[in-house]
């Protein structure tokens, strides 16, 4: 029988199958952070259980950590307690841990791939919805709840029913000035935030194959915003060369043998997909969200939509509420909308390639008056590499803040927050009401577009700026 990439990974990890179709699924890698793990470890402690495979588990701190002046420690009591609790738990249960003083520390979905902890063909889980990021390597990666975190810690398995297969094919070549972030926003704009419900999305097509690994991680990261359980890209030579030599990846002849297996994971020609969606890459332009859901997206050269043109009353009511919250008027041009804050970071867009893209815009320019701009590397390794390349100097000379790694302003769980009414151009993945701080207004876009907003003080079509390709 012809099988998809998802089918092959799933079948290889089924320990047992129950009569109702539920499977006991073996988990290769379990990633843990400070927010969703405390109750799970406490459950183990109360039951007198151990972590089944500490060697297949990695813990990091990312959500609650400060990204500036770390010498002062974590000031917010609840955040400090969560970090201290994780430190206590990993020490007690013998789980490897990248703490705040470890250069490998960072956002879990940046750290896993860059360390080679995440590998093609693996099943990977974490108590975090954006675990789908790791699917860029050709892994089946998805978020789980705290009770499931405890289950994996105790058994290295999960009870799961298989998802449906969905193929998103992006044909042709992406136009100049467009990025993976524009691609995934266009996909979500087309299928909606419920479009992938019950499915695992496999991304394919010439435009997807042309993406580097950072770009593939961006699109897989936001599969959740399309409603999918996970996102996947079949591993290829781009994947293998990117993984070669990474600390936790196989080495030498073991790596070569692994590549032979990884090549076999690609979907069979003629394999069945329950749903197929096709986009033409040539039609994708720089995108930006206007509302409070990732599906509320328009072209940067477009206008704010009119609720009166919506097809039903529920949607009209929803759109009016969003416009009121975002302080926007129907028909207004999305370009030239003033911004107060720019955030370049998050598990969606904080890798070295993202920072290079933003630095290409920032170089020789300066952050506009009245705008605060933050650049937050996704890990200590990314920060170190950026500083070796001189990207930090480009940002600092342009008036950006250069931060330590962490989730930062992606979510309001640490000191980096918006204040009510502030408008932010953000490279993160969610624009819900209050996501970046109570009353904050979020516009999702690419790193290059965010940098363009920072130096012009408004949402700007990056294609109108004269930008050098290298930094």
Curated annotation (Swiss-Prot):
Pathway the protein takes part in: Amino-acid biosynthesis; L-leucine biosynthesis; L-leucine from 3-methyl-2-oxobutanoate: step 2/4
Cofactor note: Binds 1 [4Fe-4S] cluster per subunit.
Organism: Granulibacter bethesdensis (strain ATCC BAA-1260 / CGDNIH1)
UniProt-listed Gene3D superfamilies: Aconitase, domain 3 (3.30.499.10)
EC number(s) from the headed UniProt entry: 4.2.1.33
Function of the molecule: Catalyzes the isomerization between 2-isopropylmalate and 3-isopropylmalate, via the formation of 2-isopropylmaleate.
Assembly behavior: Heterodimer of LeuC and LeuD.
Key words of the record: 4Fe-4S, Amino-acid biosynthesis, Branched-chain amino acid biosynthesis, Iron, Iron-sulfur, Leucine biosynthesis, Lyase, Metal-binding
Name under which the protein is recorded: 3-isopropylmalate dehydratase large subunit
Catalysed reactions, as listed in the record: (2R,3S)-3-isopropylmalate = (2S)-2-isopropylmalate
Leading EC class: lyase
Lineage: superkingdom: Bacteria
A biological process term (GO) from this entry: L-leucine biosynthetic process
Residues reported in the UniProt entry to bind [4Fe-4S] cluster: 347, 407, 410
Cofactor entry: [4Fe-4S] cluster
Annotated GO MF terms: 3-isopropylmalate dehydratase activity; 4 iron, 4 sulfur cluster binding; metal ion binding
Family from the record: Belongs to the aconitase/IPM isomerase family. LeuC type 1 subfamily.
